[in-house]
A protein has these predicted regions:
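Polyanion-binding surfaces on beta-sheet-dominated domains and ring/shell assemblies
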Residues: 1-272
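Short acidic DE-rich linear segments
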Residues: 272-279
């Protein structure tokens, strides 16, 4: 339930009206909670259903996590990984007796503030996570920032809401469930279930395909891809870990966790303020 309203004209100033209240009436909420209490979740069934989806839905495991590079101030390189937005929604759906919501709650001259909300009906637990979305961006080749138009602002806010909702969901669910799902997804990327009549491609072939899809989708050259892999070689133990990283990197780029210049062209990287959790 994402209650946002954006001026539709692409050249009009972006305006999104804040909404602070949950879009659900108290009597309806009470009925939902009573239903949850009379049908409590089965944790083993929750885990089994999450795993089953990964096993029977082709490609779901590859979309279940992100993996992005991180360079610390001392020059060290590592990978930051976690469940994707799609993974969070899958976990919430199978958790049952809950709902999530996302909305714009405030703004200032530079940013919109969006909340992701997760409510566990059975536990009577509400978790809220906030993300800040900049009203400005830095065009390529520009020395300064310019305001986002209405269409761009709408997309940026929706991305921010999705991330805030994901953060609220993952903060609410048990760590053991989230970690087990994350690990299972990576295992299935390396060793996918055999499809009837089809032979599983080698990891090396799938690595090459992973490179190719990133190059095609994000206009990365083959030389840029190889330079990136070489420069971050310490982050991969073997071809299997490289494969899981490439698929997670695709998700990270797609979901806006990081931009393509930051990954493949660090010397020329522009760093627009991306949606992030407000501390």
């Amino acid at each position: 339930m994402n209650d946002t309203s954006v001026v539709p004209a692409a050249d009009a100033p972006a305006k999104i009206e804040p909404e602070n209240s949950l879009s659900i009436q108290a009597d309806v909420l009470r009925m939902m909670m009573e239903g949850a209490w009379s049908n409590p979740r089965d944790l083993e069934k929750v885990k089994a259903n999450c795993f089953k989806e990964l096993e029977i839905v082709p490609g779901l495991a590859a979309r279940a996590y992100y993996s992005i590079p991180y360079n610390d101030k001392g020059g060290g390189k590592s990978l930051v990984e976690g469940p994707s937005i799609k993974a969070a929604m899958t976990l919430a759906r199978n958790w049952h007796n809950c709902f999530n919501d996302g909305r714009v709650v405030d703004e200032d001259k530079s940013n919109y503030y969006v909340n992701g909300i997760f409510f566990d009906l059975e536990a009577n637990l509400t978790t809220i996570r906030q993300i800040k979305v900049s009203k400005f961006y830095k065009p390529k080749g520009s020395q300064g920032v310019v305001p986002r138009n209405a269409d761009m602002m709408y997309l940026a806010v929706q991305a921010g809401i999705s991330k805030a909702v994901r953060n609220a969901i993952l903060a609410s669910l048990p760590d053991w469930l989230v970690q087990a799902y994350f690990n299972k997804a990576k295992q299935l990327v390396i060793n996918p279930p055999k499809e009837q009549g089809k032979e599983t491609e080698s990891i090396q072939v799938r690595v090459q395909k992973g490179k190719a899809i990133i190059c095609k989708e994000f206009k990365v050259t083959a030389d840029e891809m190889e330079a990136y892999i070489t420069n971050n070689a310490d982050c991969y133990e073997d071809d299997a870990s490289l494969l899981t990283h490439l698929l997670g990197l695709f998700n990270g780029l797609k979901d806006g966790q990081i931009n393509v210049d930051q990954v493949f062209r660090p010397k020329n990287a522009e760093h627009p303020e991306m949606p992030r959790e407000k501390k």
